[in-house]
Amino acid sequence: GKKCSCDPLNGYAEIQVKTCTLDISFKPVFKSHMSVDGGIYYTYGPFLLALKIDENCSVDTKEKRQTADFPAYNIYPASPWNYAVSGWEAPEIIMNESSEKPMWSYVPFEIKIKARVLENWELVRIKRAEKEFENGEGIDEKQVECGASVVDEDNLVTPKIPSADFVKENLGEEREITLVPYGCTNIRLTVFPKYFIK
């Protein structure tokens, strides 16, 4: 094979070849994007990225619907997650090799960027019972036949993206963080608060 030039039109390049074996390589680009709520999220080629967070995982003993074969888990962050970014970070891209097949147990690449700790931006506890169906019990008859019960939720969730003033007042030290493909995470922080560079 030989290299040839092409002029992409609207992001597409037409390649005409005779019958042959062909490998095509595309170089993914690391990009930051502004979310509708004013935060920043990142992509690398077709991959949406999320913060790599250590996990504290335990079986939820209060969940009545779990079985030994299909347990319910509580998964909480075991490493810092409260970071703000500028959207102008220079990435360090690390490609990971694996001989595993299937390859689901490893992260194919990691991207390291600089971020700032955002003090006082903490998880929020939401406690509620589902009451969404007409019978007022939160479940319908078919679900009862299958053994369902009212869902009592007691969740820790990521708070909304804070205001620019909150970010400015609570901006902490700079640290290196690691981004990985969204699908390689169980706990997901994808949209980061934005801080402005002076």
Regions found by a protein language model. Give the residues of each.
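Short, well-structured beta-strand segments within conserved domains
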Residues: 13-26
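C-terminal beta-rich recognition modules with glycine/proline-rich loops and embedded aromatic residues
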Residues: 26-198
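Solvent-exposed beta-strand/loop surfaces of large extracellular or lumenal domains
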Residues: 1-15, 32-37
